Regions:
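P-loop/Walker A NTP-binding region and its immediately flanking N-terminal helices
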Residues: 7-203
Length: 204
């Protein structure tokens, strides 16, 4: 849903703004071939730590952890909307699964990096807690956690707006947060950390 591609003939010029003037002529047809439109925020989203702006202390801490192989099983990213929490989480997923090895400088060229950038990496799960608040949604996530990664080195679970989860969903997640498999990393993101239970905060 991020990209709209338009192919074929367009008599009205609805998707060809530069050619609308010509399209108004009834005796001519316009051909719009593979015109792709993408939201600028998506197009220019940072894809590595070096391209992030304004998060120096966070980047330094994560880079050190990756380079020294001192990785926690769960991270909590907090901040207002649009500061880059989900973007940073995806970069962490790339750093963990880059085919060159666990690194603070993922190559961006290997199959794993490209699939994560495209949102198609099988071992990266992104859950919008605002839309999936219930225990049934969380049970599906936890049930999947028992299986080893299919394509990557680690499974990465990114749970956005985690404070929106129900109390029962938080309780279902606690056991896995306490004793996660070695191959599983949680990245929780929230705009309202005060609403996240203390039992969850203490495990991040």
């Amino acid at each position: 849903a991020l990209t709209i591609s338009v192919e074929g003939w367009d008599r009205r010029g609805a998707f060809c703004p530069l050619l609308r003037q010509i399209s108004l002529q009834p005796d001519r047809l316009l051909e719009c071939r593979a015109m792709t439109y993408q939201v600028l925020a998506r197009k220019w989203r940072p894809k590595n730590f070096a391209s992030l702006v304004g998060q120096e202390h966070v980047v330094q801490a994560l880079s050190n952890a990756l380079d020294k192989q001192r990785l926690h099983h769960a991270y909590l990213f907090t901040g207002t909307r649009g500061v880059g929490k989900t973007t940073l989480a995806r970069i962490v997923a790339k750093a963990l699964n880059c085919e060159t090895g666990v690194t603070a400088t993922p190559c961006g060229e290997c199959s794993a990096c490209k699939q994560i950038d495209a949102g198609r990496f099988v071992d990266l799960l992104e859950l919008d807690a605002a839309s999936n608040t219930g225990i049934d949604n969380m049970r599906e996530v936890i049930d999947n956690a028992q299986y080893a990664p299919t394509a990557g080195r680690f499974k990465a679970y990114i749970i956005d707006e985690v404070h929106m989860l129900s109390k029962s969903a938080f309780n279902a997640m606690l056991k896995t947060l306490e004793e996660p498999p070695e191959y599983l990393k949680f990245v929780l993101a929230t705009t309202d950390p005060q609403k996240v239970p203390v039992t969850v905060l203490s495990r991040c």
